[in-house]
Amino acid sequence: MQEQYRPEEIEADVQLHWQEKQTFKVTEQLGKEKYYCLSMLPYPSGRLHMGHVRNYTIGDVISRYQRMLGKNVLQPIGWDAFGLPAEGAAVKNNTAPAPWTYANIDYMKNQLKLLGFGYDWDREIATCKPDYYRWEQWFFTKLYEKGLVYKKTSAVNWCPNDQTVLANEQVIDGCCWRCDTKVERKEIPQWFIKITAYADQLLNDLDTLESWPEQVKTMQRNWIGRSEGVEITFDVADSEEKLSVYTTRPDTFMGVTYVAVAAGHPLAAQAAVTNPALADFIAECRNTKVAEADMATMEKKGMATGLYAIHPLNGEKVAIWVANFVLMEYGTGAVMAVPGHDQRDWEFATKYDLSIKPVILNADGSEPDLSAQAMTEKGSLFNSGEFDGLDFEAGFNAIADKLVEKGIGERKVNYRLRDWGVSRQRYWGAPIPMMTLEDGTVIPTPEDQLPVILPEDVVMDGITSPLKSNPEWAKTTVNGQPALRETDTFDTFMESSWYYARYTCPQYDQGMLDPAAANYWLPVDQYVGGIEHAIMHLMYFRFFHKLMRDAGLVTSDEPAKRLLCQGMVLADAFYYLGNNGERIWVSPTDVTVERDEKGRIVKATDNEGRDVVYAGMSKMSKSKNNGIDPQIMVEKYGADTVRLFMMFASPAEMTLEWQESGVEGANRFLKRVWRQAFEHTGKGAVTALDITTLTEDQKSLRRDLHKTIAKVTDDIGRRQTFNTAIAAIMELMNKLAKAPQESDQDRALTQETLLAVVRMLYPFTPHVCFTLWQALQGEGDVDTAPWPVADENAMVEDSKLVVVQVNGKVRGKITVAADASEEQVRERAAQEPLVAKYLDGVTVRKVIYVPGKLLNLVVG
């Protein structure tokens, strides 16, 4: 081997070897235990970022480790290739989304290969290819036939100038991102999949996901939002109309002081006929952004309708208001308001000077003070007539029973979860396989006409989807009858909801999945991805698996056994103020910093000598210009160094702070390992290790080696604390560096240690380990080498170091035989001069002995 560690030379050679040998290509082997490790597939944005590198390095470490355990390991990769960014980029670059996307895929694929990830490239998929989305279209038609797909009108963001639908991210301060026109809410027909039909399964099966983060499961439980409550019907005063609301707090029912309805509610429309101001307010509500997050944070506004509902238990009139925070598509489109015991209702009532009536006592039995906020805790009822004195549960049931008995209430289980709207009024997505006949009948596209292919040779104007602007595309025939194709495309979450299953049989053309392959590999054993996908992608991912199970395509209930959510990658961010006071962000690679004695940045200047403000560490992003290009780091330090830093700098699920000094440290460690191997191999052949003739020092080093193997095995396999595994290997290498190399046995022990270290480092730094394994004359390639096994006998200690205390203060440390009795330890302790000094002339009243660790003598 050469003397210097030169990653730029060895990494390309090793990657070529893997490619030629098809090292990571796998097939189903029924007699072999399988392991399916999957990282969330990337969107082909053009370049990898450090978040990608972290995600895929974690997956690769786990995959390589499992291969070394002798398992048949599948680790595939592909491209989540549809989506809105491609449309914007196509307009900007005067091209079409398809060529832009395919060019990005080619570039990013090369980047992934440079990082040495062990993918089975024969299984690569791109979700924008017809051979992929045809089966998604086929499956959608089957769901339609089962009654799990339906069409209904739903609100979207509409730009009246461009006559187009806008995604939430295209609405900026209530205006169209392109033409700055005020955006409206518009109801248009859209396709939905009945995820609510699976709400109970999705909720209950969370309990079976023992190896998923509790945080993700909690977020999904909250998103599904199962609640038990009562649907209550109010009469409307001086009218035949009825008004229904749903509540999970019937115990507060006697505190209702008003009812709020959505702008789209029939009562709102009825009242607006004779109230122009109300009609204007309803129109304003229609211009509210559709996203639920926006609804939660926007200013709450309302207007009285002049109508009143009759409280069904006390006969009082309560005003009916239109409120912008009530949505028609949620529940009944109306809510009962109890401002005494709901904070949103309290804020609204305070703003509009509406009555606030307390009906729940504080825990100490006192009446609540509602002057500053609502009292939202549960407690005993008062101000509630016949229900006074009841606690929450008794009050809930008594009022619910009374409402049911009067025929104006019905106990119901409700869900916060809403059916999945899969229609997108965009071009760059999979066409929805539905069509409309001349008589208006809507039918699924016949199987022999699938896939409905998205035309790729299009001109983007940045406004209208080419599918909608070209009326010829929609024209087709069914059984000789003219028909029009659906011009909406699927939500891109559709593609990412089942890709993991298609990886098991990407070339299969007889159906959506090859049952034999799918049921060999599934479920995924380890899934890796960001916590930001907890409720959207990971919910649809679980839902689709259950749909495929019920269609007979898979046999398991859940798609992934174990989930690891890696933390974000942070980097320093710097800016200066522009002429208009705006922040202009400067890349950290263009900034020179000065630090104080504690390493804190105290001064920063950019390449032009301009003082810049240090804004702290934040997530790497384009907006703050603080992303670090992985390719530059690989060219500078090598892929192995970047991978090692990524796994060592922080626990996998925590945020990682990018520090180039840390990258340099990882590089120095690999150089040190290389140098130790170079010096060792330079001394010629090694004799066999004879463990029966080892000296105490040699036994100690070998004990440390096998303890390290045991720890690293547990850290990678069970605990997934990869950073502590690397730290243990580093500590072992420090001990090896201090060990003598004179005798044959010294060198034989060094050989055993280095061969084990190379295998333990291999999942993290595969290129350098491949090369070192050959230099150390390991058997075969390290790619097929078994994981090292800790020798239990080697870990047994002949002696123990025991701390001796007198009255709780340390007075000495003694070495005793590992199997020494308490009596023998006491005798040995008494021989220590300092211990003997404190025992002279006193009586030992009590002895506390922790075997092999501590002896405390209590004297008086």
Curated annotation (Swiss-Prot):
GO biological processes: leucyl-tRNA aminoacylation
InterPro entries: aa-tRNA-synth_I_CS (IPR001412), aa-tRNA-synth_Ia (IPR002300), Leu-tRNA-ligase (IPR002302), Leu_tRNA-synth_edit (IPR025709), M/V/L/I-tRNA-synth_anticd-bd (IPR013155), Methionyl/Leucyl_tRNA_Synth (IPR015413), Rossmann-like_a/b/a_fold (IPR014729), tRNAsynth_Ia_anticodon-bd (IPR009080)
GO cellular component labels: cytosol
A Pfam family annotated for this UniProt entry: tRNA-synt_1_2
Sequence motif 'KMSKS' region, residues: 619-623
Motif ('HIGH' region): 42-52
Cross-referenced SUPFAM superfamilies: Anticodon-binding domain of a subclass of class I aminoacyl-tRNA synthetases (SSF47323), Nucleotidylyl transferase (SSF52374), ValRS/IleRS/LeuRS editing domain (SSF50677)
CDD domains xref list: Anticodon_Ia_Leu_BEm, LeuRS_core
EC number: 6.1.1.4
Reactions accelerated catalytically: tRNA(Leu) + L-leucine + ATP = L-leucyl-tRNA(Leu) + AMP + diphosphate
Superkingdom of source: Bacteria
Chief location category: cytoplasm
Record's keyword terms, sorted: Aminoacyl-tRNA synthetase, ATP-binding, Cytoplasm, Ligase, Nucleotide-binding, Protein biosynthesis
Binding site for ATP: 622
Subcellular location: Cytoplasm
Matching HAMAP family: Leu_tRNA_synth_B
PANTHER family on file: LEUCINE--TRNA LIGASE, MITOCHONDRIAL, LEUCYL-TRNA SYNTHETASE
Family named by the database record: Belongs to the class-I aminoacyl-tRNA synthetase family.
Listed name of the protein: Leucine--tRNA ligase
Species whose genome carries this gene: Pectobacterium atrosepticum (strain SCRI 1043 / ATCC BAA-672)
